[in-house]
């Protein structure tokens, strides 16, 4: 999905001082790292300017931050990123904002003001990556587009995320995840697709699926661009849209009946048609199609029976069940930490 174009803190004073101490070793040359650097993550020593907001951009940036990059989140003065006020919160800190902006530093800059624009251009001089998810053309009007910033820092990897793409009849449309769900065909899939009963209502996916998939795709595209730069490709522009990412993600299975052009293809149902949700006396499980009434079994009893017969199965967890699931606890994927504001 990413199309590559190859070309040959809270206190500004503290931020400036920290930037002057940055290792001046060129980042486009292979360098030997010590054991301490490795412990700090594979992207330690790289600086990311995160000009993005809401989910797709910030979540891409937090992946880079978790891998050791120094991410500086740039927000408008006052309210900041609008997602600060979305969803569950404590002490004025929303959970989703905390989750996708951890491990970052923050600075407030008014990008509409000439002095704010100049400040970003100064920050770009020592940056490795700039990430933004404004609508196409918006940053060009502010003098912060790729062509302008490339002249300041030819080694810059500039990543642009947008909703619909740079061109086309929808390019200027304001876009959120639910819009991409509508266009991508996934509502038809959720309703049962070709096998749906007449009049079956269309169904949304009850998570911001394509925001998050776009974020992960962007993070991968950025690291690929950094690898290309280390091999001598120089700075480049990584571009992807949520719609392109959704089509790419959906295509292997949800669109397999549309992959062969012309006649002669043998069509098939969806992968979801081979599995089912089976109710139990105290919950439910998901497995391959059983075709029998399982309500006389307790969940764990039925799970054990199917596992014994080498049938893939999972009990249906409620969201609150996930926290105590023994497999989740065993892997340690969830960690409890103290937050100075959220607790």
Language-model regions: role of each:
Residues 63, 67, 140-276, 281-289:
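Active-site-adjacent "lid/gating" segments in soluble enzymes
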């Amino acid at each position: 999905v990413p199309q590559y174009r190859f070309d040959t803190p809270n206190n500004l004073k503290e931020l400036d001082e920290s930037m002057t101490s940055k290792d001046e070793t060129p980042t486009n040359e292979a360098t030997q790292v010590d054991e301490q650097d490795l412990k700090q993550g594979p992207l330690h020593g790289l600086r990311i300017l995160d000009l993005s907001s809401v989910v797709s951009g910030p979540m891409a940036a937090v992946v880079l931050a978790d891998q050791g990059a120094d991410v500086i989140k740039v927000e408008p003065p006052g309210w900041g990123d609008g997602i600060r006020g979305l969803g569950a919160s404590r002490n004025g800190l929303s959970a989703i904002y905390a989750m996708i902006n951890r491990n970052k530093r923050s600075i407030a800059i008014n990008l509409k003001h000439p002095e704010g624009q100049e400040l970003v251009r100064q920050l770009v001089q020592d940056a490795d990556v700039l990430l933004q998810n404004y609508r196409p053309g918006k940053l060009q009007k502010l003098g912060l587009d790729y062509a302008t910033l490339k002249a300041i820092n030819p080694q810059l990897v500039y990543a642009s995320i947008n909703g619909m793409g740079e061109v086309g009849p929808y390019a200027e449309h304001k876009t959120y995840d639910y819009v991409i769900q509508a266009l991508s065909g996934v509502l038809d899939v959720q309703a049962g697709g070709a096998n749906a009963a007449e009049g079956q209502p269309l169904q949304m996916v009850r998570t911001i699926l394509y925001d998050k998939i776009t974020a992960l795709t962007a993070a991968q595209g950025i690291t690929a661009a950094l690898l290309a730069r280390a091999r001598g490709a120089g700075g480049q522009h990584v571009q992807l849209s949520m719609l392109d990412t959704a089509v790419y993600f959906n295509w292997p299975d949800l669109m397999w009946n549309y992959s062969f052009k012309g006649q002669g293809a043998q069509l098939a149902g969806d992968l979801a048609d081979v599995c089912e949700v089976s109710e139990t006396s105290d919950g439910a499980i998901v497995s391959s199609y059983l075709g029998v009434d399982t309500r006389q079994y307790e969940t764990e009893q039925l799970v054990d029976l199917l596992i014994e017969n080498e049938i893939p199965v999972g009990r249906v967890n409620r969201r609150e069940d996930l926290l105590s699931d023994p497999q989740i606890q065993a892997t340690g994927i969830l960690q409890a930490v103290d937050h100075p504001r959220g607790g």
